[in-house]
Amino acid sequence: MSFTVAIVGRPNVGKSTLFNRLVGKKLALVDDTPGVTRDRRPGDAKLIDLRFTIIDTAGLEQSGPETLQGRMWAQTEAAIDEADVTLFVIDAKAGLTPADETLGEMLRRRGKPVVLVANKSEARGSDAGFYDAFTLGLGEPCPVSAEHGQGMIDLRDAIVEAIGEDMAFPPDVDEAETDIVLPRTEPGSEEEEDEEPVYDETKPLRVAIIGRPNAGKSTLINRFLGEDRLLTGPEAGITRDSISVEWDWRGRTIKMFDTAGMRRKAKVTEKLEKLSVADSLRSIRFAETVVIVFDSTIPFEKQDLQLVDLVIREGRAAVLAFNKWDLVEDPQAYLADLREKTERLLPQARGIRAVPMSGQTGYGLDRLMQSIIDTDKTWNRRISTAKLNRWLDAQTTQHPPPAVSGRRLKLKYMTQVKARPPAFMISCTRPEAIPESYTRYLVNGLRKDFDMPGVPIRVHYRGSDNPFESKAKKRR
C-alpha cells in the first residue's frame, strides 16, 4: 500500500460505515449506538484508482487518561500519528458540535494533512451543517454519503490534493500490487483440500485469541507486540470488534485476531453484544489455531469448557493459555491440579497443550507461541496409507469390532482423506452399525500412536462394495 489514512471524528458520525465502504467489506461493526468502535482497525482500501491502508478509530471524546474514554483517545492519537492524511468526519445532518470544534483544533495543531468529510450529506437539512464546517478552518468540506456511496470521486480528489500525486501514485508500485487482494480460502473449503500435505512455514499463521470477558486477551496480544496496540483495562467487555494484527515470531509471520469476550448465550441480550459475538465466531472459523484464554484465578468456568468444545466442533487446532499466572500462589501444585482437570473435563481434546502464562509480566509467552506452532503442525499432519493400514490391523487384532445381530463387523481399509483437521475414511461392512464407543477407541489410538494431542480427529466410515451381494440376494 502506498500511504496510510486515518478516519477520526466524534462518536456516531459514520466513521465505520465509511471504513466498510472503502475496504469493500463489512469488517467493522456498525450500529446506531454511539461508541461502537474502540480499538483502531486497519484495512486495505480501494477508492477509484487509489490503493492505501485505512485505519478506523474510536469516536473521540476528551477525558482523563486513566478512563476508558481517555485510553480510546490515546489509541486514536496513535492512528493519526501513523497516518499520512486524516479524514475528519462530521455529521452534516446534525451540524457542528463543540466536540467537532475541539477535534478540529487538535488536528490543526498537529499540522498534518487533513480532509474534512461532511458525511450524511444526502439527508434533508444537511446544507447548514456543510456550510458550518467551513468555520473549522480545515478547508472546504467534502460532502459524502458513506451509507449510499455518494461523493466518492470527490473524496478521492480531496485525498490526492492533500497528500500530493507523488505519494498517492508512487512510481515503484506496479500493476500487480494495485489489484484487489482477495482473502485466502478459509480452512475446510473444497479448494484447500487439494493443497500439498507438506507443512509450509513460510505462510502466515492465522491465530484467534478467544475467552470470557476480562480474561486478558488484549493484554496478551499487546505483550506479544511489545506495544499498547489494543485497548485494555479492568473493565469487562472493552473489545467489541475482532481486530487483526501482524507480527513476526522467529521469522514466521503471525496474524492474530483479538476478539470480544464471549459470555453464555442466555446472558447476551443487547444487539451490540450479539454482533460482537458473531464477529468473534467468524474469526474462529477463519483462524487455523485458536488460543482459549483462561483466567487462572477462576479457571474451568462452564463458559470456558463450552468455548473449547466450540473450537473442537469447528475443527480448529486449540491451545489453552492459563493467563494471570502471576496471581497464582503455589504454582507447582496448582499446575498439577489444572492438568488433572484439563484431562478430566476436556476428554474431546485429550492431550491439548496448556501453557501457564502472564500477559502482564510476559511469563510463558515463548512457550505459548511454540505450543501454537507445534499444534498447527499437528493439525496439518498427514499419515501414509500404508502406516494407517498396518495400524488398523493392529488395533482390530487387539480389540476387534463388536458383533451386531450375530455378525461381526469388519474394518477392511483405511486412508486419510484430508488434513486441517486430520480426517480418515475406513472402508467396512455395515458402517451404520459401528458403535460410537468403537470410534472413540480408534480416535484415542490415532491420537496416541501418531502423536496428535489436542487436535480434532474425524473418523468416517463407508460401506465396502460386494460385487456378489446382488446375486446372493437373488438365490435367497
From Swiss-Prot:
Residues 381-465 form the KH-like domain. GTP 2 binds at residues 211-218, 258-262, 323-326. The keyword GTP-binding applies. GTP 1 binds at residues 9-16, 56-60, 119-122. Residues 3-167, 205-380 form the EngA-type G domain. Disulfide bonds: none annotated. GO terms for molecular function: GTP binding. Pfam families: KH_dom-like, MMR_HSR1. GO terms for biological process: ribosome biogenesis. It comes from the Bacteria. Keywords: GTP-binding, Nucleotide-binding, Repeat, Ribosome biogenesis. Associates with the 50S ribosomal subunit. Belongs to the TRAFAC class TrmE-Era-EngA-EngB-Septin-like GTPase superfamily. EngA (Der) GTPase family. GTPase that plays an essential role in the late steps of ribosome biogenesis. NCBIfam families: GTPase_EngA, small_GTP. This is GTPase Der. It comes from Agrobacterium fabrum (strain C58 / ATCC 33970).
